[in-house]
Amino acid sequence: MSTVVEKSGEAKPGKVEVGVKLRGAEKVARIPVKIIPTEELPKKPDWIRVRIPVSPEVDRIKQLLRKHKLHSVCEEASCPNLGECFSGGTATFMIMGDICTRRCPFCDVGHGRPKPLDVDEPTNLAIAIADLRLKYVVITSVDRDDLRDGGAQHFADCLREIRKLSPGIQLETLVPDYRGRMDIALEITANEPPDVFNHNLETVPRLYRSSRPGSDFEWSLDLLQKFKQMVPHVPTKSGLMLGLGETDDEVIEVMQRMREHDIDMLTLGQYLQPSRNHLPVQRFVHPDTFAWFAEEGEKMGFKNVASGPLVRSSYHADQQAHGNKIG
């Protein structure tokens, strides 16, 4: 199994050119902890079974994304549910490019210096969604710490264009933490709010330094609460990955903190190591434990809890928003 150790006196890599995507070992070279590659990925338990993404609908959606120069987080983050979602004619769109300014070692999205925003992306995204005749869409993004508003205006522009071409559509946004830009980002977001506002805490506070370098647990909680205070009629949502080294007690404590910050919906899923150069899986959480977390979440007052090994923040997001049980 991989181990995480402190760095000491290592030479830093040179400056990355704009538009160059770093992945694997190159991506995590500068984070506060060092990832020692695993010799082999851990064997998944019997309860984790993923559909192979092979169908005409999968190919059709991929071709449509390429045609409009769009990205799906389903592909970029190597989501295990890609086949199921694409085969069902749905996708979670990732805006503002496919290069992230953060280096989270659990994530398979590439890191680097992103290109300038594509001013045509809101229109292209709206056209693609209209072509697919979608009723519920999740829009997410890479982190864009290079932008004055963290990309909030681009989110708003995308929502506005989508609503022009697809009246009645429901839109969920899965936003970054807008580090250092919360006030301006929330002001923009409140003027063109989504139907569901989602921001993932990802893990417990103790593991932030090793799992989410550059992010802050309390900041993320405040982002969700402040949005709720500004737009109280819009549900808020957050999620955790389990298997990074957290304890069950820590998960329960974070769930309680979420409720204290008026978060309405919760997703809990199993962390799966994307490659040898990512954080190792510390445990595979049994489905019975996921079911127990869901029961505890309902007792706490969450309007909906999606909890299961293959649950992801945008997995069956439409059903969760409509109150259906997922897990």
Curated annotation (Swiss-Prot):
Checking InterPro entries in the record gives:
Aldolase_TIM, Elp3/MiaA/NifB-like_rSAM, LIAS_N, Lipoyl_synth, rSAM
| Keywords linked to the UniProt accession | 4Fe-4S, Cytoplasm, Iron, Iron-sulfur, Metal-binding, S-adenosyl-L-methionine, Transferase
The residues that the entry says bind [4Fe-4S] cluster 1 are C74, C79, C85, S314
Associated pathway: Protein modification; protein lipoylation via endogenous pathway; protein N(6)-(lipoyl)lysine from octanoyl-[acyl-carrier-protein]: step 2/2
What reaction is this protein's catalytic activity? [[Fe-S] cluster scaffold protein carrying a second [4Fe-4S](2+) cluster] + N(6)-octanoyl-L-lysyl-[protein] + 2 oxidized [2Fe-2S]-[ferredoxin] + 2 S-adenosyl-L-methionine + 4 H(+) = [[Fe-S] cluster scaffold protein] + N(6)-[(R)-dihydrolipoyl]-L-lysyl-[protein] + 4 Fe(3+) + 2 hydrogen sulfide + 2 5'-deoxyadenosine + 2 L-methionine + 2 reduced [2Fe-2S]-[ferredoxin]
- Enzyme class, spelled out: transferase
Q: How is the cofactor bound?
A: Binds 2 [4Fe-4S] clusters per subunit. One cluster is coordinated with 3 cysteines and an exchangeable S-adenosyl-L-methionine.
PROSITE patterns per UniProt: RADICAL_SAM
Q: Where does [4Fe-4S] cluster 2 bind?
A: C100, C104, C107
GO cellular component entries: cytoplasm
Annotated SMART domains: Elp3 (SM00729)
Q: Known SUPFAM superfamilies for this protein?
A: Radical SAM enzymes
Q: Where is the Radical SAM core domain?
A: 86-303
Q: What is its EC number?
A: 2.8.1.8
The prosthetic group or cofactor this protein requires is: [4Fe-4S] cluster
- Give compartment(s): Cytoplasm
Q: What Pfam families does this protein's entry cite?
A: LIAS_N, Radical_SAM
The record's comment on protein family reads: Belongs to the radical SAM superfamily. Lipoyl synthase family.
- Report the NCBIfam families cross-referenced here: lipA, PRK05481.1, PRK12928.1
UniProt cross-references to HAMAP family, sorted A to Z:
Lipoyl_synth
Name by which UniProt lists this protein: Lipoyl synthase
Q: What's the name of its gene?
A: lipA
